[in-house]
Amino acid sequence: MLLADDRVSVFFDGTLGDPQLDHPEGVAVATDGSVWCGGERGQIFRLDPDGTSIEEVASTGGFCLGMAFDRSGDLFICDMKHAAVFRLEVASGRVDRFCDGAPGRPFLIPNYPAFDAVGRLYVSDSHRFGAPGPGVFRVEPDGRAELWYDRDVTFANGLALAADGSELFVAETFASNLFRIPIREDGSAGEREEVAHVPGSLPDGLAIDVDGNLYVGCYEPSQVLRIDPAGTVDVLWHDVTAHTLAHPTNVAFRGTTMFTSNLGRWHLTRIEVGIEGLRLPIGDGW
């Protein structure tokens, strides 16, 4: 493993609290340093930057999966129960149903959102459990969507855009693959390029650091992988007890610290990576 055990700890334990942090899947960091995550009953939680308190800000009424902030500070949440992407206007607390998919092609399992530099939202669609299918949608700022990558994927999951916006990394969970899709000059999707195969692992959430390393939260086994730009795969940290890392899913950076959600328990984990994460959304203006 690349990291010693003392670099990994529980950031917030919501097992017995009120509100209870129930099996969080998505995690995102706001510009004020607060850490946001979702619950299995649609709750949207905000944790103070130091992890000392939690507030249920809003709810989709469904099951929250991946989430991402846009440049204005609003939070976008993929919801499995409603098969939709919701938008939380953070300033007012209002939740709107933002997108249901493309005309004639609704979302099936919208799983993970990622913004590009001009405010378009890429959304993975996991299709169906056990049935490969397309793919990745792209949603305009006004909510209009297209099926951007229409090739079959075996459970498209986490997404991460390269710093220059030239390619989109995708976790293909049930094939144990990571691949990238070049974004052509006209904005269309290129052909997939394999990044790494991680046999025995179920890759879920993705994040990138400023050196171009790709970080992968793995639902099984409970570990985070790091893949360098050459495609070398290392285990950043593995929890053989599935206790501190308990089936981690999504991962998000705040400076050199990474936060992981844990679908298997009721807490968030903090990992001191030691390398600055790529600030999101990508692009100039920070």
Describe each model-derived feature in a short phrase.
Residues D48-T52, E89-G93, V139-R144, P182-G187, ...:
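Short loop/turn segments that connect beta-strands within beta-propeller blades
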Residues S176-N177, A196-T232:
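Loop/turn-rich, solvent-exposed surfaces of beta-rich toroidal or solenoidal domains
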Residues L16-D32, G39-R41, T60-F76, P103-L121, ...:
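Beta-rich, blade/repeat-based domains predominating
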Residues M1-Q20, R192:
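A short helix->beta-strand "capping" segment at the edge of beta-propeller domains
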Residues G39-E40, M80, S126-R128, T173, ...:
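Short loop/turn segments immediately following the C-termini of beta-strands
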Residues Q43-F45, A84-F86, P134-F137, N177-F179, ...:
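A short loop-to-beta-strand structural motif that recurs across blades of beta-propeller domains
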Residues V10-F11, E55-S59, D96-D100, L147-D150, ...:
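Beta-propeller fold detector
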Residues W36-E56:
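Beta-propeller domains
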